[in-house]
């Protein structure tokens, strides 16, 4: 149980979250309280790079079972480096899981879809093929962290996260944020290939990790 001192979570996205004034963003999370606890109110905030608040909503979490809570955020300003902040508005203990902020405006209006401007730019190139999800990212740093496509389909909230092959480039951070949420998975990749008129070229792990992985090597696989 915490005093009301702004206890919560702060997420900067990838070097800031780009937000446009007047556009709508779907926020969701799964939450629960401890058995017998009173409901807990949470403030869902968007703050700019100067830490000024420009959008705020509240949700009330109740019950010991996991439930999904949603609100729509409509920022009052355009900001290239905003942050998503979740703070407690009342005392209590609450568990949070699968927090998401997603623009309603996506390429072809696909739920969980691509960023509209970048996807359109790619489509305008008229690519013949679309290769995904990459090369070394499929191998992982060892066999345990290889890309497993079956973990990237189905309900987004059930997809396990995985370390990113290149997250070591964020060694200056205590908590490197270059992980794979797998919110963009094989189904979405195939769907996007269709949307841009390109032949899908899926890359599948062959059971051999990157030979250049520090301490990983071939993991006993010849």
Task: Go through each PLM region and give its residues.
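Anion (oxyanion) recognition and catalysis
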Residues: 194
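Extracellular and organelle-lumenal recognition/adhesion modules and their flexible linkers in secreted
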Residues: 1-181, 197-203, 214-220
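Generic structural signal for well-ordered alpha-helices
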Residues: 118, 186-190, 222
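Conserved radical SAM core fold
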Residues: 207-209
């Amino acid at each position: 149980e915490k005093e009301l001192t702004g206890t919560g979570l702060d997420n900067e996205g990838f070097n800031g979250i780009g937000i446009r004034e007047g556009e709508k963003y779907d926020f969701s999370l799964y939450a629960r309280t401890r058995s017998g606890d009173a409901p807990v109110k949470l403030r869902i905030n968007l703050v700019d790079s100067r830490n000024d608040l420009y959008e705020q909503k509240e949700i009330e979490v109740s019950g010991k079972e996991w439930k999904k809570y949603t609100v729509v955020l409509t920022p009052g300003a355009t900001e290239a480096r905003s942050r998503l902040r979740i703070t407690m508005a009342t005392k209590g203990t609450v568990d949070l899981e699968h927090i998401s902020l997603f623009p309603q405006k996506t390429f072809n209006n696909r739920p969980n879809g691509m960023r509209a401007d970048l996807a359109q730019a790619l489509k305008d190139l008229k690519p013949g093929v679309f290769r995904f999800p990459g090369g070394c990212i499929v191998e992982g740093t060892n066999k345990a962290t290889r890309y497993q496509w079956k973990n990237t389909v189905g309900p987004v909230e059930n997809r396990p996260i995985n370390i990113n092959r290149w997250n070591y480039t964020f060694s200056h951070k205590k908590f490197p944020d270059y992980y794979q949420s797998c919110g963009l998975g094989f189904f979405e990749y195939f769907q996007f290939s269709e949307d841009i008129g390109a032949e899908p070229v899926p890359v599948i792990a062959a059971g051999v990790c990157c030979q250049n992985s520090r301490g990983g090597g071939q993991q006993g696989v010849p």
